[in-house]
Each structure stands twice: as structure tokens, then as C-alpha cells.
Amino acid sequence: MIFASRAFVCLAWIFWIMIIDNFAIGKDNASMSVIEKPEYNPTFGSTYQRVKARGKVICGTNPDFLGFSVLRGEAAGFDVDICRTVAAAVFGDSKAIEFIATNGKTRFEFLRDGTIDILSAATTYTFTRNVIKKLEFLPTTYYDGQGFIVRKTLGVSSAKQLEGAKICFSSTGTGAKNIADFFTKHEINYIPIPVPPDKNAKNIYLAGDCDMYGTDRSGLASNRLSFADPERHMILPEIISKEPLGPVVKYGDQKWSDVVRWTIYVLFIAEEMGINSHHLNLMPTFVK
């Protein structure tokens, strides 16, 4: 709940940023009155108005991601706290939030059709998703990389020792290409087992249908904690990709993307300044 706690502390910073921005805009407008204004027609969507009218933010999350979206069956962790922070920025109440479970198939569909307002589910920022699929990625909040998990009984200490292994991975993420590139580079044969989003790759691995499971290392660590016998599994040392993870909103919805983007930036500023819930009562009144 670190992010959610910081949200209330940071609302003052959002307020002052808006004042400074408005002051700057006023100065710009005054100077522009003597020259021709340039063409500038940003597309403003309706998400912000819809959220305000509804009275809550709807956030899409990964329901199985311990430490990021769930703890003891409750919505808790890094990703969901980002959504709570946005709710605090918009309504002054981090509880003005609803969480909807998404997977690799539904997450972008829900964003486009308005089922969710923001996707915060360990989603990798890629060129294709941003430019081709038209999704608005916000500041990266977690830098990750893809790795592998195996059973210790396999007797290996490196992915390079897995000649001919069966490897499970999600069919909808960035994993397939990362795995293909890695094993091609090292001239290792393997048997790919792509798993559709409605069948969790973790479960296929636990059922014994593959020797190794590949995904982001944060996901591997989270999944391992959920295993009945986590000590029998190990995450291999290889990091085979760069995975910048962060929230996503609908493309072209300028006002809403600005709200979410600058809420995240304010969290970064608070982190740098050492502002957190532990010394909130010691902060000056205007910051509270």
C-alpha cells in the first residue's frame, strides 16, 4: 500500500503543478496575442468525464500476480496501488476504485471498449503495441526482463543446458519471440508450447506438460511463491530480454492520459524527496 499512502501526500504536489502550469499557460497566451497562434488541436477523449460522473476509477489487473495485484485473496500490491493513487488524485479517495481481472486476450480489448479506464497489469511497452495497435503507454514503473523457472530435479543451473526441452509461455505476450531469439542465438533446440490466455502457462508447467516456464522474472518470482512446494523450483540466472512495464490507457485520450501520467510523475518526485507515509505527520500542513 506504499503507493496508495503516498498518493494523499502527493495530492498537494499535483495541485501546485497545476497552478504552475496554468500560470505558464497564461503567460504563453499573453505572448501569443501579438503573433499568430499555431494550429494545435489535441484529441480530448471522454474517459475523464466518464470517470468523474461514475465516481470511481475502473482498473484492469492481473488477478494472479502476488506482490503486484493480489495478497491473500485481496487486491493489493505494486500495480493496484498505482490505480489507487490515480483514484486519490481524481477524487481525493484511494478507495474510489474498482478492479477487473484481465488476461493476455482481454486486457487491450477492455481498454478499447471502455470496460476499464486504466490497465495496470505488468504490461510491456513495445513499439507494436504503441504505434501499430494504438495503445497509450505511460511512464515505466518497473523494469524487468524475461527469465525461466525449472524444477530442481531437472539438475540444471542454466537455460543453456536445456537442449530439447519443452518450454511453456503465454501465446499473447512478448515471450515467444524472446525465447526463439535466445535459443536460436545459442543454437539450442527446444520444443515451444504456446499457452492461450484462458489457460495459465503456470498451470501447464505445474501439470508437468513442459520442462520449463518462461515469463518476466517478477512474474516467475510471484508464481513461485504461489506454488505448493516453491523450494522445489528455481529461477535460472539468464535474463533474455528487457521488459519495461507500466500502466496503459486508451490511445488519443489526451486529458485522461495527462492525469495518469502526471500522477505517476508526482510519485517519482515524492520518492526522490523521501516523502512517504512513515513521516506524514511531520510534514508541513500545506503538504498534507
Name these PLM-found stretches.
Residues 24-28:
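Boundary at the C-terminal end of the N-terminal hydrophobic targeting segment
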Residues 30-42, 48, 81-84, 152-156, ...:
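Extended ligand-binding regions for polar small-molecule ligands
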Residues 32-121:
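Extracytoplasmic small-molecule ligand-binding "clamshell" domains
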Residues 52-53, 87-95, 112-116, 153, ...:
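Sec-exported extracytoplasmic/periplasmic mature domains
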Residues 58-67, 75-90, 124-126, 144-196, ...:
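Bilobed "Venus flytrap"/periplasmic-binding protein-like clamshell domains
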